[in-house]
Design a protein with these regions (language model features):
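Short glycine/serine/threonine-biased micro-segments
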Residues: 22, 49-52, 73
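Short, well-ordered coil/turn segments that N-cap beta-strands
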Residues: 45-49, 69-70
Length: 124
């Protein structure tokens, strides 16, 4: 989940603030949408997924891993915090350990409560 379409109106004129009208909404507001997308994609396919959308902390990354992402990426947070990758990695390790996981990837698909589904196979 990179962005979803959004619209912001000028409070005074009630005209769109962007010349094109709509733009991309990103950041923390996307996290629940990204989690739902990863959860559904994992359940449907079992294929490797890179979770993207609203990750600002290690706890957020661990949520995506638990939902079925085998990796996650940072986006909007980098504008405000260029050091976020280092911080998030450290937080991720602490969050996993605090929840009893030996490593962050040990939490992989924990939200699904069972073994990974069989990935879809290509039909010739």
């Amino acid at each position: 989940m990179n962005t979803i379409r959004g619209l912001v109106l000028d409070e005074r004129t009630l005209a769109p603030k962007l010349g094109s009208g709509v733009g991309g909404l990103s950041g923390p507001v996307l996290r629940p949408v990204a989690l739902a997308a990863v959860f559904a994609a994992y359940r449907a396919t079992g294929l490797p997924i890179v979770g993207v959308g609203g990750v600002e902390t290690g706890a957020h990354g661990l949520e995506l891993i638990a939902a079925g992402a085998s990796a996650f990426a940072l986006g909007t947070v980098l504008f405000a915090d260029p050091e976020a990758p280092v911080r998030v990695r450290e937080e991720l390790e602490r969050e996993a350990s605090a929840r009893g996981f030996a490593t962050p990837l040990a939490a992989y698909a924990a939200a699904h409560g069972g073994p990974p589904p069989t990935p879809l196979r290509r039909v010739a």
